[in-house]
Amino acid sequence: MKKMSYAAFAVVFAALPVHAEELTVATAGDQNMVDYINQYLGPLFEKTYPGNTVRAVGTGPGDAGSQKILERFDAQAAAKSDKWDVDVAVVHEKFVGPMVTKNYLDKYRSDIETGKLVTRANAKMALGTNVDGYVMPMFNSQTAIAYNPAVVPNPPKSYAELADWAKAHPKQFGYNGIKGGASGVSFVMGWIYAFGGGDANTLMNGPFKEDETKKWDTAFKSLADFTTNATLTPGNAGTLDLLSRGEIAMGPVWVDMFYSWQANGQLPPTMKLVLPAPGMPGQPMHYVMPEKAAHKALAEKFIALATSPKVQAEGIVKRFNWYPGIDADNVKRELDDATWNKLFVDISPADLAAKGNPFPIAPYNTAILEAYEKSVK
């Protein structure tokens, strides 16, 4: 998707026809996010609720896409608009906190039937901000350790076991450091959760304490030694590529990318995943609804449909290899055994609930990345 300037973004919204039955959904993310709404979710909603239409407006990939939605909300709040021109937005986790603290969002989750199907902590806290009730996860993306069982018949179940394995098998573990993709960043954050010497829950949920950052010296020294013994890859895809060619036997990956590569024949079907204790970070994208949305009742119906077990199974799991936003056990009955076993045979719903961690809150996240740059050469 081409990047859209803030001015162009505003023009697109201004050009949308105003109809009582038209629901406007703004979504950050790649073009596949817009296509998902325009080609699947929107038509399904229109069929379920005849007479209504859905319009998706894509704001661009990555954090910049969510930033544009936040800026749109800022502009409408500054203009004191009675009704806002976005009914539903899909945004990255880190932008929900500012939206809640600025009182932009409706606390709608308890008003929809699927609200009770959400169990993960990231629907309550978003990088240190209490967002409970304001969000419904569209999906959860997760990192894990991919491995070749022909080389690693008994994969490490914890970071401590992983460190021992890598020491015994030089250059067979590969990761991209903190450049070229967040799979490596996630691995580093998990290392600090495991060996940082402080309280991992404080890193995830706050509050920020400068003293906490001074506990990491030993963890970064051990990570520097570990990295000397590892293979540095060029990025998310680079790790998968080296795995596929047998140049490494283990490395951190995004689970959806892993399964997509397998489905496309780019990765051997024998490759497997493990989520080591105490866990690795992932992140959701959230459905939010502005407090001043023009079509709030319709927006609630849209989000309820989007987070229903059937749609989560067909739209999120089957189409994208993402983990569902609602508790996976509620989706299982809607999936055939082959699909369920593919996505959950290595990492179970219980594993996700226990070890699918959030990234650290922003100040800790920044401090960890800066410390990595200084400590790991």
Where is each model-derived feature located?
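Ligand-binding "clamshell"
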Residues: 100-108, 129-132, 261-275
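A structural signal for short loop-to-beta-strand junctions that line the ligand-binding cleft
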Residues: 78-88, 106-145
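Early extracytoplasmic/lumenal segment of secretory-pathway proteins
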Residues: 21-93
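Conserved C-terminal helix/tail region of periplasmic/extracytoplasmic solute-binding proteins
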Residues: 345-377
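Ligand-binding pocket segment of bilobal, Venus flytrap-like solute-binding proteins
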Residues: 187-189, 193-270
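Sec/Tat signal peptide C-region and signal peptidase I cleavage site
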Residues: 16-20
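Short beta-strand->loop
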Residues: 26-30, 130-138, 147-149, 170-184, ...
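Mature extracytoplasmic/periplasmic domains
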Residues: 280-281, 285, 289-352
